[in-house]
Regions:
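Short, intrinsically disordered, low-complexity segments enriched in Ser/Thr and Pro
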Residues: 135, 499-525
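Extracellular "leader-to-stem" segments immediately downstream of a signal peptide or signal-anchor
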Residues: 1-10, 16-88, 92-95, 99-107, ...
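Short beta-strand segments enriched in hydrophobic/aromatic residues
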Residues: 86, 209, 398-399, 463, ...
């Protein structure tokens, strides 16, 4: 329990007769966290519930896999690269009840049930305080409900989701903040239901919703709360979108629809644009950054191209500095350098990432620093002149001392023209000081783009320290899903920068500093869409937007769902 351990399922079929539960620790704070279930791929590792399994034949929903209940302490849980298959005559089965906090993911997973079997495929609504977390490359087939997202905390980001053949609803959201890109739904029932009488808020972009029965009276999207749409196609339904939030919404879309960009309500604001009404139709041209997909970096042959940091003198106890060992492993010519699980490495000082290495992987292990560590991605500096890999991935690693305050974050400096990917990592600060693209995924830390013209794409980023969280100085910054807590500006866009952020959650759980803006724009461009706040101490954000263009500064103290710069 709580050990950053990987449970590996080799290729095969694994029959289960009852719920697989995440481990219990000696104390509640040690339970159901830092546990990673890793398969060999959706075609190779299958967890199967046989037909008519007694444990799943009752009336109360029962999970095949359960990963823990509230509070928000389920750090780094993950389910990866496998299939969950529910056989016939299992009406109570829930494919996966998943919970993770700050950083954790469901990636490359298929959940399917036979006809008339199963309640929910992916259940993210069985307990409060789920998230922030990342779901990517998920397919759900069958079940009454494909996906369930509920409760008012802590936001969930999705990318590339396929829903098919649900019996009641494709997706049921109540209260939760959902940030979604790339939904494809083939269904006879509504693809999305965003339920009334809640704080539920959804952003949906780059999605296709296909109805399989055009004469069906159900809408493709049944929205009763707050939604933002961009590049969403709905076809095969009598009504594409039904907005019915007590006459506060903009109305319905009848027949097929292709929404270029719109909101369910009139809640688009701008400090410098004149809006006759608070809609995109009144906003004029709105420019978005092009979306780049995170590059897929080859794994190579572990027997020939991987290097274990222990073989180069690293200290697995963390009592002494292992930066020298990491540098030697990088310079060895290996394509992958790995930090074995179960160890706690200490890194102080500087390491240069150079030469053929293209992946530094923690195998879900942990590290820390006592005096500060900087990993520099540099070009042409290998001591033996070996060629640099075009892309470098740093992934599946926790800097545990930086989890709360951020004072001892491990700094990754991109000084290179090469691509940098940081994925499934906690406790890092990425500095963009070069020309190469930066990709952050399932990331808990902070980001600064310091070199004008450099670009970053972020998919689920969580920022937990006080002070400025993300700073974009003249770069191009794209975000899908951001959660921030503690006081301090969420995003600064400065000196010609361009920020395009969709899905932002502010958890102002420590109050707010009155003169500190949540978002600061100076002689730059920003599109901020899908902004939500949760506050339970009666001291919410008091200054939302400060924008300076030329010599003029304007502020907005009230919240907005969408904010457009000049």
């Amino acid at each position: 329990p709580n050990g950053n351990r990987v449970i590996y399922l080799p290729p095969g079929e694994y029959e289960v007769s009852n719920t697989l539960r995440w481990p219990i620790g000696a104390e509640e704070g040690e339970s159901q966290k830092r546990t990673i279930l890793q398969g060999a791929g959706v075609l190779h590792s299958v967890i199967r519930v046989p037909d008519g399994t007694s444990a799943f034949s009752g009336r109360e929903p029962k999970a095949v896999i359960w990963t823990g209940a509230m509070p928000a302490n389920r750090l780094r849980n993950a389910v990866r690269d496998l299939k969950i298959a529910v056989g016939a005559e299992n009406p109570a089965a829930v494919g996966l009840q998943f919970n993770a906090s700050n950083q954790g993911c469901v990636r490359n997973v298929v959940i399917e049930a036979e006809a008339d079997s199963g309640v929910t495929g992916l259940d993210l609504g069985y307990t409060d305080e789920i998230g922030s977390l990342f779901v990517q490359n998920l397919a759900v087939k069958g079940f009454e409900y494909g996906i369930s997202t509920k409760w008012p905390l802590n936001s969930i980001t999705f990318e590339n989701v396929v829903l098919r053949d649900q019996r009641r609803l494709g997706w049921w959201n109540y209260h939760q903040m959902v940030f979604l890109r790339g939904l494809v739904s083939y269904n006879w029932v509504p693809a999305i239901y965003n339920e009334r009488d809640s704080w539920g808020a959804m952003t949906v972009m780059d999605s296709q919703i296909i109805g399989l029965e055009p004469n069906n009276a159900d809408p493709g999207i049944a929205n009763q709360r707050q939604m933002y749409y961009r590049n969403v196609e709905v076809a095969g339904y009598n009504r594409a979108i039904e907005n019915s939030d007590r006459n506060r919404s903009q109305g319905n879309w009848i027949g097929a629809a292709h929404l270029i960009e719109d909101t369910s309500h009139r809640n688009v604001v701008s400090q410098f644009r004149h809006l006759d009404e608070s809609t995109f139709a009144a906003a004029g041209e709105v420019r978005h950054l092009p979306v780049k997909e995170t590059p897929i970096v080859p794994w190579g042959d572990p027997n020939l191209e991987w290097a274990n940091i222990l073989d180069f003198g690293a200290d697995a106890t963390g009592e002494t500095n292992s930066s020298g060992a990491l540098q030697r492993a990088i310079d060895s010519g290996a394509h992958t350098v790995y930090l074995p699980g179960g160890a706690r490495f200490r890194f102080d000082g500087e390491v240069q990432i150079r030469g053929p290495v293209r992946r530094i992987i923690g195998l879900e292990g942990s590290c820390h620093s006592e005096s500060g560590a900087t990993w520099r991605l540099v070009d042409g500096q290998h001591p033996e002149g070996l060629e640099d890999a075009p892309e470098v991935v740093i992934e599946r690693l926790e800097n545990w001392k930086a989890l709360r305050g951020g004072e001892l974050e491990l700094v990754v400096q991109s000084e290179s023209a090469r691509t940098l990917v940081v994925s499934s990592a906690i406790g890092f600060r990425v500095l963009g000081m070069g020309r190469g693209d930066i990709f952050l995924e399932d990331y808990c830390g902070h980001l600064e783009l310091q070199n004008p013209g450099q670009s970053a794409w972020c998919r689920q980023i969580t920022c937990r320290r006080k002070g400025s969280k993300i700073r974009n100085c003249g770069g191009n910054l794209w975000i899908l899903g951001m959660r921030a807590e503690r006081t301090g500006t969420l995003i600064e866009t400065l000196d010609g920068g361009v920020t395009d952020a969709t899905g932002i959650f502010v958890y102002s759980n420590q109050g707010w500093v009155d003169e500190e803006p949540a978002f600061f724009i100076r002689n730059s461009s920003a599109v901020l869409s899908g902004i939500s706040e949760r506050n339970f101490n009666r001291r919410p954000v008091s200054l939302w937007f400060r924008e300076t263009q030329g010599g003029e500064t304007r502020e907005l103290k009230s919240p907005a769902w969408v904010d457009l710069s000049k």
